[in-house]
From Swiss-Prot:
Descriptive protein name: 3-dehydroquinate dehydratase
Source organism of this protein record: Teredinibacter turnerae (strain ATCC 39867 / T7901)
One GO BP annotation of this record: chorismate biosynthetic process
InterPro entries, A to Z: DHquinase_II, DHquinase_II_CS, DHquinase_II_sf
Chain's gene name: aroQ
Residues passing through the membrane, by range: none
């Protein structure tokens, strides 16, 4: 059994109503529920955080190492293109992660084509709407199956 952390970056709390032609009509709660179901079916623990504040995401990443989180799925949203601090937090804790995006960032504005995370991620999933999260979670399962986490004993 592993522990997976899903981090949702800025403005993702508006899913379902914000630019639905780009991001779809599913809410963040809908996505989280699907992911929780998938994790429970596999016997894994799943934690979530959505924040519009960079420091909250960074603090949660730091806490993840202390808590023994085995894998992170992160949609850094707009921080993808701006946050060296968030990148440094992920690199600093050494927890493997997948970068995830609802839209295909490469088919959008040029400023969205650069990511501060993709070169240190296990992989990147983008362009499949809410299914991007499910695909990223499946990638986490596959990674964890190949790299079995050590069991914690209380």
């Amino acid at each position: 059994m592993a522990t997976i952390l899903v981090l949702h970056g800025p403005n993702l709390n508006l899913l379902g109503t914000r630019e639905p032609e780009i991001y779809g009509r599913e809410t963040l709660a809908d996505i989280d529920q699907k992911l929780m179901t998938l994790c429970l079916e596999r016997g894994h623990h799943l934690h979530f955080l959505q924040s519009n504040a960079e420091y909250e995401l960074i603090d949660r990443i730091h806490d993840a190492r202390r808590e023994g989180v085995n894998f992170i799925v992160i949609n850094p949203a707009a921080f993808t293109h701006t946050s060296v601090a968030l990148r440094d937090a992920l690199a600093g804790v050494g927890i493997p992660f997948v970068e995830c995006h609802l839209s295909n960032v490469f088919s959008r504005e040029a400023f969205r084509h650069h990511s501060y995370f993709s070169d240190i991620a296990v992989g990147v999933v983008c362009g499949f709407g809410s299914q991007s999260y499910e695909l990223a979670l499946q990638a986490a399962f596959n990674y964890l199956d190949k790299n079995k986490p050590e069991q914690k004993h209380s």
